[in-house]
Amino acid sequence: MKLLYTEISYSMTEILVKEARAYADKGYRVFYIAPNSLSFEKERSVLALLPEQGSFAITVTRFEQMARYFTLAKAANRQALDDNGLAMIFYRVLMQLQEDELKVFHRLRTDQAFIAQLVELYKELQAANLTAFDLTTLDRPEKQEDLITIMTKAEQLIAQGDYDQSSRLAQLAEAIKSKSLDDELRQTVLVIDGFTRFSAEEEQLLALLNEACEEIVIGAYISQKAYRLAFTKGNLYEASLAFIQQLAQQFQTKPIYTTSEKVFDVSFSRLTQLLEANHDYSKLDWQLSAKDKSKVVIWQALNQKEELEYVAKAIREKLYQGYRYKDMLVLLGDVASYQLQIGPIFEKFEIPYYIGKQEPMSAHPLVQFVESLERGRRYNWRREDIVNLLKSGLFGRFQEGELDQLEQYLVFADIQGFTKFSRPFTLNSSRQYPLPLLNQLRLAVVTPLQQLFKSQKQLGASLLDKLMTFFKTIQLADNFEALAGSRREADREKDEEVWKAFTGILETFYQVFGQEKMTLADCLALIKMGMQTAHYRTVPATLDVVSIKSYDLVEPHSKPFVFAIGLSRSHFPKQTKNTSLISDQERASINEQTASYQRLDVPSFENIKKNHQTALSLFNAATQELVLSLPTSLTNSSDDVSPYLKELIALGVPVIEKGKNRLSHSAADIGNYKALLSRLVAINRQGIADDMTSEDRNFWTVALRYLKRRLADEQLSLPAFEHHLTTKPVAPEVIETRFPSHQPLSLSSSALTVFYNNQYKYFLKYVLGLQEPESIHPDARIHGQYLHRIFELVTKDRTDAAFDQKLGAAIAAVNQQSAFQQVYQADAEGRYSLEVLKGIAYSTAPVLNLNQGMQVAKQEEAFELALGHQALIRGVIDRIDQLADGRLGIVDYKSSARVFDIGAFYNGLSPQLVTYLAALKNKGQGLFGAMYLHMQEPRLSLSDFKVLDDQLVAAAYKELTYKGIFLAQAKEYLANGSYHLNNTLYETDELETLLAYNEQLYLSAVKQIKTGHFLINPYTADGKSVQGDQLKAITRFEADLDLGYARRLVVLPVKERRQAFLTRMNEEIKHED
């Protein structure tokens, strides 16, 4: 074994390539081994250093892939399971285990995260040359027992599928021990680059290869100064030192210092030397020069978006200087938080990029299809699962409009379960659903699903055949191809990888579970688990892209220009978290009991060494310029400066406060078409910034004027998102069609209430005619109709029967009416609602019997009230009562508590009672009032009563009173009845004021409606919160941001509140006159 080390300013890759080429020239087969995370980039750099740009004698690969070269012929018919297959294996094992067979993990049997942890533990035990039986020092013996049970059954299933149970490295080790590869290995040389540690499995293999191969060459970056130190704890090179020294001791060889012909920029090595001195407690008598400081710089931006835009502009600027995209590397401190923002910003600046990261498939439509299919079977045709299955776009050939209609009907008719799906749709409503079309769609959905779901327990291979027939029937492959064809090229590549993973999962299922009997539910659950845990990785279509990856995967001298962003304290250094099933303490305890070449990694123990090594690689990642950046605000929370960056700042590395992106006329701002257009749009929205220089302001003013002129020629306009709640008037011809000018505008009190609640809601409901989803299940409207009908029959009954008998007969008659039978007898929920309503009827109806001096004159009385030629008000009055003197009163039944509030009326939110009074007064009828009757079952707190006597009954009846507007002149007729008269009596002139103001409310609304301009203005009572309907899903109204759009109600002090509102009404009436 030959161990080589060199200074960070030299190229270890060049040194090792030179070694590899020398052995290749002698006729040896050379394997150039790199870590998994660096193998792709390492292959490029190695081939670039070879004079021929390639060699058949030198293979750049990974340990596992090298093992395949030697063992492929020995295991020709056996394959290793990938992570998806292992996830399916463990899920099947956990499905078969009973709850009492697992003492610790029994509650996690179906947990996806737990299954992922089992997969990782299985692979980790292989790499550590351990089994579950070796985990003898876990905190709880029951934990080891559970793991032994799970792992043993998993290995049995793997053997059943004739898959390899051992890793490729273990197979190669066994082959070497058997001497079957001696001849090949004598002509083999290994060159190992980029490692600072080996796993136990790799160590064992390396020891065997050292005896069998011609030579093993291993290189690492270590400074001569660090190599000579006796104490290396905390040294910047500690990881590499420990790595090389351990190998030197084990294989009895002395590391050799060497250099390369290529020497990188001395500025980076000078910075490294200063950092090294900080960590080995030595001193240097020099500092960074001006040239050194020009090579390394620290940016501090406001947030992630600003940070990425500065990086994008810097990349564009390098392009103008003649560099290529492939010369740039972007490193991320936290990939998850930056990944979503990179795409839009880099696309705006037209920068092609590649993120070298595995992505989960869970959000892909194919995974959603599989999940919905499995849930549809498991939950017996649950509606949302069937709808999600259809909406995936992979089931059959349906038009989007057809699916919308089907979904609406399924919600309306409450279609749940196979029984309802299998029967023809017959229910309909006033909306007249197209039942023939819907039944055609129902058959197209139900027929293939029913054929699949009726499959009985059988061999997995048979179930898979039925599943493939189902896929063919619904045209899954064709639909997937159509879906991929409609997407961007980058997404099409992802689709291809997802399809490969899907077919691979089906093949694995056939191989492992093909001869095992199981139910269809188990079959679908296994495939779903494989899909949920699957990941995919795409490769760039071209090499000329900006590479993006996590900063801890970088190696020295990667690219000429490196931008490392997001280097806040939270992410630089990285804090390793152990999320496995075995804690760090348990790992350390296990390692103490194991033999040589058996070892579990203990992440926290290696954390400091690993972070120092990462920082060393990062600070030397660039060959020309290095930018280290951090946002002051990271995902909406401020973060401190990284300790490594603090070191650099102390050494004199300059810090640039980037601040907010300023618009200028520099090449970085105007040299790219999309970015320039984006900036012009931003200026149009925000205006020319005051802090621009006069030259910049002139440039952008002229550019914006030019753009607007060009857009006007093309009949286009710039969006104005800062006024995102500003609405446009409806075209006059549309208003004329909807509300003809020669006809009065038809309104109702409820429509007027909607208008003053939020004008835009009126537009949606009464102009566009949008309707809320309906249901066959009874709602508040149906409940109200039911009680109305009962009260109508009771009041019409003029027989001498007792009141309770009349009420019972009315309830029985209403229950027999088909309209109510259909909704209240359909299911248990409806029957329960019916019992509740009967209780309310028995509680409220006695009020009808208390006012003996009152007669019911009319019920369900329709009316029309004309306001000149401008408006026609229509409505229906629930009940009209008549006093002995002939005066009429209006009763409106309510299912919730309501009172007449003069403030709400003034603000247009409660016009109903006054509108009804106006309708009767218009007919020349005398009036005594208008009132609400709350249909309820009074609820009283018994703790409020000392004695359960007649006071309890009186209190119950007090809740059942008429509340509203009453004429003071009628008080003597009402005093002994069930009327709430406190502060509800109005004089005749006051009532006239209410009626006149009510007319003004209608006419003002009509005037605004006729303009066709409807504001998004939900009302606010206190100016702090919004009480009106915000319609967030449609308008994007946010109360905390858009409070200025809300309509502020007029709110007056409680003292003399009624008189104050009446005064304001009179003033406004006079003003209008």
From Swiss-Prot:
Keyword Hydrolase on this protein? yes
Under InterPro entries, the record lists: ADDB_N, DNA_helicase_suRexB, P-loop_NTPase, PDDEXK-like_dom_sf, PDDEXK_AddAB-type, Restrct_endonuc-II-like
The entry lists its GO molecular-function terms as: 5'-3' exonuclease activity; ATP binding; double-stranded DNA binding; helicase activity; hydrolase activity, acting on acid anhydrides
Q: Which residues cross the membrane?
A: none
Q: What family does this belong to?
A: Belongs to the helicase family. AddB/RexB type 2 subfamily.
Q: What does this protein do?
A: The heterodimer acts as both an ATP-dependent DNA helicase and an ATP-dependent, dual-direction single-stranded exonuclease. Recognizes the chi site generating a DNA molecule suitable for the initiation of homologous recombination. This subunit has 5' -> 3' nuclease activity but not helicase activity.
**Assembly behavior:** Heterodimer of AddA and RexB.
What's the name of the protein? ATP-dependent helicase/deoxyribonuclease subunit B
